[in-house]
Amino acid sequence: EPKSPLTLFVSQVDNSAYPQVTLYTKIADQAGSTPSSLDASQFTVTETDSSGSQYPATVEQVVPLAVGDAMNINLVVDQSGSMRARSKMDSAKKAASSFVDEMVKTQGNVAEITSFNDYVYNRQPFTSSAALLNSAIDAVSPTGETALYDALYWALQRTNLKSGSRVVIAFADGEENSSNCSLNDVITLSQQTGIPIYIVGVGGDVNRSSLQSLASSCNGAYYDAASDDLAQALRQIYQSIYDDQRSMCRVVFTSTCPGSTSATRTVLLSCSDSGPFAGQISHTYVPVTSISSYDTSVSSQDYVLPDSASKYYSRSELEKMSLWELYLARNEIFARHGRGFKNQDLTDYFATKRWYTQTYTPEEFDAISSSQLNDYELKNVQTMYEIEQSRNSPYLETAK
């Protein structure tokens, strides 16, 4: 009996539980649909290490992504000066807000907001809170140059901290002109981490061939967004990318390869000889990736508010910031004096700042804080806290 051909495409690799490995794989029949009769016995996996030695592994699970399977999405937003033209920034914000509102309705989904101009800004770490995500999107304003590669590199590093289905979706309206990281740096890191990059380009200044090549090399795709109705075009593209990722199957196996876990391997996923289907796909990955969450080669600012110890900030100035940035700026004042933190996002963030040294536990510092802070700092902390209260910041419910 002739076998039914299948088209296989490995979009991403989750190696967070290595030696157990999960391949997020598009499995489609000739009609473009995922067959309903898939099971693990119909597939085989063979790993090839850097020396060419081959090691078979048993496929333990082949299942479509269920509604409850978590997705981790890093949404990268261009805030360079060219985004001022034709209300592109407003349209991009509307589309991004609409997307995250829908995305977080699925239990387990989380997103992070990254924006960029000359610098890269972590506007909001991964969360399922629509309020925090929309606050981050609202805080983005256009100015400066276009450090797209830095932003993508940063987003890959941050997304690599998550387990499960992971994807970076970037929006850009101009050509890269300000990054420390190179195109090859981004492609290499995407391939190392197994995280795909999808890119949406808008306007005539976009280098389409370069971005298409980048997205393709990163197992993603490139989209053109019509600028005449940008908000609607972006909403449709974001939904298409989301649907594409949700159409994947999880192919799970446990590696038997004894080689170096830091060297690139090739995994061959094939339909088994005894099964009803025919098809195969190879994919390279690195079993264990030691990737920092915040890399110093990326241009990011040392302080949220560098002069909060010498300037009184008005409410109108501070209200332009996202809830995460307010929370960060308030705790940045404490961090300058050596306070430690219980919140893991704060701990991760300040650990990358060369100026930061923890001197006190949170409890020790809170007992003496009134004598440590000057008048500017005390007033700024009070104003930030009042704004956070008025905006019902979820961060007020978390450990500092």
Predicted regions and their residues:
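C-terminal "exit" segments of structured domains
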Residues: 14-19, 216, 223-294
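Exposed acidic/Ser/Thr-rich ligand/metal-binding surfaces
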Residues: 71, 77, 88-93, 97, ...
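Acidic, polar low-complexity linker/tail segments
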Residues: 10, 15-74, 79-88
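Acidic/histidine-rich, surface-exposed loop or edge segments in extracytoplasmic proteins
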Residues: 26, 73-81, 116, 303-315, ...
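Short, glycine/polar-rich helix-capping loops at beta-to-alpha or helix-loop-helix junctions
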Residues: 204-213
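Proline/serine/threonine-rich low-complexity linkers at boundaries of modular beta-sandwich domains
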Residues: 1-4
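Compact alpha-helical subdomains of small soluble proteins
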Residues: 341, 348-400
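Amphipathic alpha-helical packing elements
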Residues: 317-358
